[in-house]
Amino acid sequence: MSAISDRIFVQEHLAREHEASELSPEEAERLKAEIKELLVQEDAVLVAHYYTDPLLQALAEETGGCVADSLEMARFGNQHPASTLMVCGVRFMGETAKILNPEKTVLMPTLEATCSLDIGCPVEEFSAFCDEHSDRTVVVYANTSAAVKARADWVVTSSIALDIVEYLHERGEKIIWAPDKHLGGYVKNKTGADVLLWDGSCIVHEEFKSKGLSDLKQLYPDAAVLVHPESPEAVVEMADVVGSTSQLINAVKSMSNEQFIVATDAGIFYKMQQMAPEKTLIEAPTAGNGATCRSCAHCPWMAMNGLENLRDVLISKRQEIIVEADLREKALIPLQRMLNFSKERQMAVKGNA
């Protein structure tokens, strides 16, 4: 096992030990009432990622916040008048919010909630890798630390990655892609670009297997298969729709199918069911069941976000995201490059994990 794999394994284990505890309905209602009062008192708005606990997603909507992907969460915070953003998600999402909203206080229920893609792309090793291939344009996925973004030429989300890499390919540029090898491989195959892949992956999406998906499809032959491109190639090849979180949600709403097999984090079901309550959603099978599966289609770091630590941080202000000014300025350059690219082509930039 490599040093990076060791780090991911240890962090994953720690995350499972600190997952938010289950609450009784009475406890949940009490905490929600406290949080609603604190949000007003602290001039704060709650933004939650699609993969967080449905209780948090519902609370964000009830209190005038939003449920979205990480970039849309940050942009919502930029447009909202609140002076404090409470970000329910994982750390790189809080950093992205801070990069785009430097004048605001950005809090998270816990700063320990990270991501296997982030852990799997440490800036020192990644920078050395880039230096070894200095003739290549560096493209990084939004699911990375501020430090890795600062080393990049472009930041991309899964919904715009194909367009940007195709643009670079047409310009004759060779590319370094990081960190997700599956998404990178998908983009490479679709565009034909010369792409050198960093060896990273999402522990949730890597668990989906084509054999289990094929077996499930036999049980539900009329179901459309929706797959996030962070999944292995064999799973992606079985998809009726390959897309970002937002694109998969829109597919459930717009497609005529009554049943959908969904290969992404199960937290997304809250929004899918809200948008299309008449549709039947089926979890795509992971590599195992119960104690034998690694993620069981739910990110252990997302599960660290809960009502209790959310309430506690609104009181203590201790879990604040800090991005140093010089790092923020460097990380903003490739991020802004993506936003400008999107604006020039009048595209909607949504859909990192």
From Swiss-Prot:
Its EC number is 2.5.1.72. [4Fe-4S] cluster binds at C115, C202, C299. Pathway: Cofactor biosynthesis; NAD(+) biosynthesis; quinolinate from iminoaspartate: step 1/1. Catalyzes the condensation of iminoaspartate with dihydroxyacetone phosphate to form quinolinate. GO terms for cellular component: cytosol. One of its GO terms (biological process) is 'de novo' NAD biosynthetic process from L-aspartate. Its cofactor is [4Fe-4S] cluster. Belongs to the quinolinate synthase family. Type 1 subfamily. Binds 1 [4Fe-4S] cluster per subunit. InterPro entries: NadA, NadA_sf, Quinolinate_synth_A_type1. It catalyses: iminosuccinate + dihydroxyacetone phosphate = quinolinate + phosphate + 2 H2O + H(+). This is Quinolinate synthase. One of its GO terms (molecular function) is metal ion binding. NCBIfam families: nadA (TIGR00550), PRK09375.1-1 (NF006877), PRK09375.1-2 (NF006878). It is an enzyme of class 2 (transferase). It is found in: Cytoplasm. Keywords: 4Fe-4S, Cytoplasm, Iron, Iron-sulfur, Metal-binding, Pyridine nucleotide biosynthesis, Transferase. It comes from the Bacteria. Iminosuccinate binds at H49, S70, Y141, A142, N143, S158, H228, P229, E230, T245. It holds the Pfam family NadA.
